[in-house]
Amino acid sequence: MLPTIITDIECLVTRPDRHNLVTVVVRTDKGITGYGCATFQQRPLAVKAMVDEYLKPLLVGRDANHIEDLWHMMMVNAYWRNGPVINNAVAGVDMALWDIKGKLADMPLYHLFGGKSRDAIAAYSHAASDTLDGLYQDVERLYTQGYRHIRCQLGFYGGNPDTLHSTRQPTEGAYYDQDQYMANTIAMFRALREKYGDRFHILHDVHERLFPNQAVQFAKAVEVYRPYFIEDILPPAQNEWLAQIRSQSAVPLATGELFNNPAEWQNLVINRQIDFIRCHVSQIGGITPALKLGAFCQNFGVRLAWHCPPDMTPIGAAVNIHLNIHLHNAAIQEFVAYPENTRKVFPQAVEPENGYLYPIERSGIGVGIDLDAARQFPVVYRPHEWTQSRLPDGTMHTP
């Protein structure tokens, strides 16, 4: 096979709507351009610097065909590895290289991987409100759109406490009360089942807001309401507690969006302490490690539910679709509708049809970026108040 030489790499940060989105563009001497998602929205300029200052000089002039070799070189070239900045930067290039390979072969990615395992992947979206009546409206809107898996949150992560027993002069932050959150969320599950029965699957994201002993209590309490899964019931640093939760509750557990390093998931998968893995594909380094992770999890009965929040590009979401159509143990795909400006910047963005995401038949990833439109929306820093999470006494807690 003739070489396909990398001639240029560009990293573009754009903020068309609420989130800063990072896209890597790889150009070649064959006139074929690849696109990848490298979004780390809290630190986008750090990723851009990694691509522009370090990966571009390393890769320009090399053969884009050798993805496996280039991935390993990018990952180890700095010696220190497997962190959110380097992994997202590597992932953006990795996805773009796979995009180029698919375009060279004139095949969509899922065909390049080996073809499909299913006709479509079930999607779930988010219903949230401060009140049950508002939540019901959101649920019914999504149900009418065809969703049969709906993530339900009463209030934002950690709930919105009706009353907060706060200190005299509270430090600025996003406050929540764990006890109120548990009580309100258990009541939410009960109300949803009483109103809707089993018409749809309920998912819920704890988002690491509980201490380990509270997580055990919560899992036992919600099991009777048959959630499809409970997400991030613990922060990664406390995942050894999953064995205790497992021993006391059959509630399905999902985790992984914060994982960077294979060491963070290997024992959880081998010991079958989770049911679904929720890795963020760019956070673990791109398509190359995601394919290996999928095959590894299949050996232990762990299913795939890739993280797909609104703070990633439609390019990254399309990569998830290709992985899910191909990988046999894919279970479900998160999806949040794109705002108008995001669709303008990514005009090929894919959306569900009656609750399913279908294969993308265009060559490569099948979703690119309108560079002129993207440049109309420059990066804007924001302090990300929701990650400044505090308990009633002012203690900072995992967001």
UniProtKB/Swiss-Prot annotation:
SMART domains per UniProt: MR_MLE
Xref: Gene3D superfamilies: Enolase-like C-terminal domain, Enolase-like, N-terminal domain
Binding site for Mg(2+): D205, E231, E257
Coiled coil: none
GO molecular function, a single term: magnesium ion binding
InterPro entries in the record: D-mannonate_dehydratase-like, DgoD-like, Enolase-like_C_sf, Enolase-like_N, Enolase_C-like, Mandel_Rmase/mucon_lact_enz_CS, Mandelate_racemase_C, Mandelate_racemase_N_dom
Physiological role: Has no detectable activity with D-mannonate and with a panel of 70 other acid sugars (in vitro), in spite of the conservation of the residues that are expected to be important for catalytic activity and cofactor binding. May have evolved a divergent function.
Family per record: Belongs to the mandelate racemase/muconate lactonizing enzyme family. GalD subfamily.
Annotated protein name in UniProt: D-galactonate dehydratase family member PC1_4063
